[in-house]
């Protein structure tokens, strides 16, 4: 059913145009609503090294609105993605007019968010997103949220592969902090 629901809004082609030298994409780890399934950007190059340089897709904690700029309550999460995007643009030497940003940017990887699916977005059902990449594709805020002992219940990304990666890389640190508290 989600295929039919999304048919009208699906990207025709997710491969970037050859005239695009660099593309950045902030992706929500915790989005579970099928109507907001992720469309990853595909590089136009066939060379692996060039592909990694053309398209940078980084996964952030939170749902679709949390990463893309949802409610004020979740702005700490979206501010993290916004700051990352601004840093990418500035690193390319492009001018960035920050006067268009209507609030101070205060990233907070520990900000709470509601990951439940409500009407009408629950009509198509829920499922974790398909993850492509490795731990290097996770923004630092994911790791910081994972090890933050003040989040109750402890952060558990919606994508099982990411949970396993974090457990392998940071599990000992998380357990060590819990024991020392």
Label every PLM stretch briefly.
Residues 1-181:
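Active-site- or binding-pocket-proximal scaffold segments within functional domains
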